[in-house]
A protein has these predicted regions:
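Beta-strand-rich modules
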Residues: 90-101
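Recognizes extended acidic, P/S/T-rich segments that occur
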Residues: 53, 57-91
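Conserved small/polar residues in nucleotide/adenosyl-binding loops
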Residues: 377-383
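Acidic/hydrophobic-patterned starts of short beta strands in beta-sheet-rich repeat architectures
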Residues: 151-161, 215-224, 304-312, 364-369
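Short, conserved, GDST-rich strand-edge loop motifs in beta-rich repeat architectures
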Residues: 160-176, 224-252
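Pro/Thr/Ser/Gly-rich low-complexity, intrinsically disordered linker/stalk tracts
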Residues: 22-53
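Beta-propeller blade termini
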Residues: 142-149, 206-214, 296-302, 353-360
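Aromatic (tryptophan-biased) beta-strands that constitute blades/sheets of beta-rich domains
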Residues: 72-75, 107-145, 153-163, 169-170, ...
Length: 383
């Protein structure tokens, strides 16, 4: 009992001394988003109105809701971004959310007889194909991300199409190319990027980051590419004729690139050599790219002000993370952490299938929690 009491006391003390995030939001470079008002018919007599609380809003901000110019809430709505309006009408209705202190407003047009509680966005499915082994494949929507690529304050969707023959790293086999589309919420397709034959399809291979990295109000797209990747304007990256796939459909040789794309047009703005590079396959734990081709990525405020993109490779044995900044013209490497470096060997094999970003020590700068290890924002110094 005594040991239990001491342990509980230490646990309570530890709970209270844990550092809290301490971001300076007056300096943090953020997205320039609108209010994001949406109105959804919940049932025949109720419409749900929801909106975005902006990081620039005062902490005590409150809101008024209007339907076709008529105020529908009795009192200002505080500490809330959700409202249920009693409305049985079947005709179109214009909902407006007004911030009382911020003096801003945003609108949403509820369609007549709105039949669904979601936006129906039509997709343009890519045509399938056939691999060198004669296997036919088709395409299905896979992962997606969001970002305001045109600066209108509204998110667009960046959608990854995976071929039906996508493989886990542990499996042999050819795959069709990975394809990315960008759609506006009204269904307009802005561009299509084809990753080409030298980027294998599978859950671990292509980690795509979507964020406004240079603060111009428009999100960029960053991901690993290869010879034959075709950007959103039709331009080919590297050697269009190169084919590094072996007889098992694996890619064990050939150059690897990191490309930053214009989020609005899909144009490749800069392509550099990918770090961490493949190097000696056995350093990662095997010789068939099962472990060397395990990728992760994230966006982190490493200096507490500007967003950086961090590209990661490996977690079963060797682990490498490389941080980059984009100033609108150049991708600049901020740092590289490599568990193969002297003094860092204990950090090999500590990762898993995901990572987390956050200010874990309360200094206002993001750290990266990589499985069982934590990397300081000024890496290559580990925590």
């Amino acid at each position: 009992m005594k040991c239990t009491s001491i342990f509980f006391s230490l646990l309570v003390i530890a709970t209270f001394v844990v550092a809290q995030p301490n971001y300076d939001f007056t300096k943090l470079k953020r997205e320039h988003l609108g209010r994001g008002v949406i109105a959804i018919r919940e049932n025949p007599s109720t419409v749900v109105v929801s909106w975005r609380y902006l990081s620039s809003d005062p902490m005590d901000e409150s809101f008024d809701i209007y339907r076709d110019g008529k105020k529908v809430n009795k009192h200002p709505l505080k500490n809330a971004t959700f409202f249920q309006d009693s409305y049985q009408g079947t005709e179109p209705a214009l909902y407006t959310v007004k911030a009382i202190k911020g003096k801003t407003e945003s609108n949403y047009q509820l369609p007549a007889d709105a039949p669904t509680g979601y936006l129906n966005i039509p997709l343009v499915r890519p045509e399938g194909g056939t691999t060198p082994s004669g296997q036919a494949y088709t395409y299905a929507p896979n992962d997606a991300s969001i970002g305001d690529v045109d600066g209108d304050g509204e998110y667009e969707i960046i959608l990854k199409w995976d071929p039906s023959n996508a493989h886990d790293n542990a499996h042999d086999g050819y795959t069709g190319p990975v394809i990315f589309d960008c759609y506006k919420l009204n269904g307009q397709q802005l561009w299509r990027i084809n990753m080409g034959r030298n980027v294998r399809a599978g859950a671990h291979y292509t980690q795509f980051m979507v964020f406004d990295l240079d603060g111009d109000g428009r999100a960029e797209v960053v991901m690993k590419t290869g010879d034959g990747t075709v950007d959103g304007t039709g331009k080919v990256i590297g050697d269009a004729n190169a084919d590094y796939r072996n007889e098992r459909g694996r890619i064990l040789t050939g150059p690897e690139y990191l490309t930053i794309f214009n989020g609005l047009t899909g144009e490749a703005m800069q392509t550099i050599d990918y770090v961490p590079e493949r190097g000696n396959l056995m350093d990662w734990g095997d010789g068939r790219a099962n472990r060397s081709d395990r990728y992760l990525a994230c966006i982190a405020y490493l200096d507490g002000v500007h967003p950086s993109v961090v590209m990661c490779r490996g977690y079963y044995t060797r682990t490498v993370l490389a941080a980059y900044d984009w100033d609108g013209k150049n991708l600049k490497n901020r740092w590289v952490f490599d568990s193969n470096n002297p003094g860092c060997r204990a950090y090999a094999g500590q990762g898993n299938h995901n990572l987390r970003v956050g200010d874990v020590d309360g200094d206002g700068c993001d750290e990266i929690v990589y499985g069982q290890c934590c990397l300081l924002y000024t890496s290559p110094r580990p925590r």
